[in-house]
Amino acid sequence: LGIANNVRFQGKHYDFEVDSNQYALYANLNQKIQTDTALDVGVRLEKLDYDYSNKMISGTTRDDGSACNSTDGSCRYFRPDSRSDSFRNLNYQIGILHNLNETTNLFARFATAYRAPQINEIYRLQKEQSIDDIKSQNLSSFEFGIKRYSESSQVEISAFVMNKDNVIIKDTNNIVVNDGQTDHKGIEWLLSYKLSSRLTLTNVGSFAKHTYSYSRLYGDIDINGNAIDTAPKLISNLSLKYEGTKSLTSELEIVHLDKYFLDPQNLHIYPGHSIANLRFTKELKNIKVSGQITNLSGTLISE
């Protein structure tokens, strides 16, 4: 099976155990710099250790040690020798909050973050791969917005810009690569209004553009500038909550997912969907009963 120099085989491909330990040091400072303005600064140092133990023959042979029917005798799957790996990352955030009045705030925040490689991304390898080539994925983001609260309403609106480097993905050959870059920008919102003492209408959503910002060929198509697959522009959740009595609550929810591409080449599209869900909670004397019906119309969707 497979191509001549990338041979799959029947049998066991991997067998390993990994012990992981995570350590973190962090500090946060919240300081008023003016009567109505506060500064929030945080820093976090994190270390993730993997102790990997291979339970099979190391290398690219079959599980019994025999060679595959390829030009050099190697097989598709690569099992590293037992080893230990560590990932250290320093992240920080700085934010500012300004009170316009008793009900309205303005805010802005810059932050960095990371995602260490997952166990399967660094130890379930193919023969072309090396653990040392896989680094942590990095993220930087900036957002600003407004929050307003009153007895009958809640409004939160923010705009954001985010960039990711060293994005970990699998290419068309199912090989983990670590050189991806993506850009994300858009708006997010939460709007809530009490229609009456028992009815509350809420809308939570985001409208954003997610794009690949690096060159990589998938077939003969360069994905640089393409929309990220499985990343819809619009996601929205509209709910109507009814609090009939102190012990009964019900909620009708409409979830909308915009269309999105199914592949990095942007050749195939999922049309999106809108579905309705119903939830209720009833508190009895000693127990709470909850239930929900999802996708009331029975619409065929992809999740």
Regions found by a protein language model. Name each.
Residues G2-N101:
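Signature of Gram-negative outer-membrane beta-barrel scaffolds
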Residues N21-A27, L90-I94, L106, S130, ...:
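Hydrophobic, lipid-facing positions within transmembrane beta-strands of outer-membrane proteins
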Residues A27-K32, T37, R88, L97-N99, ...:
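Residue-level signature of outer-membrane beta-barrel architecture
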Residues V41-V43, I94, A108, F144, ...:
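Membrane-embedded beta-strand positions of outer-membrane beta-barrel proteins
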Residues K32-L39, Q154, A159-K164, N178-P264, ...:
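Gram-negative outer-membrane beta-barrel transporters
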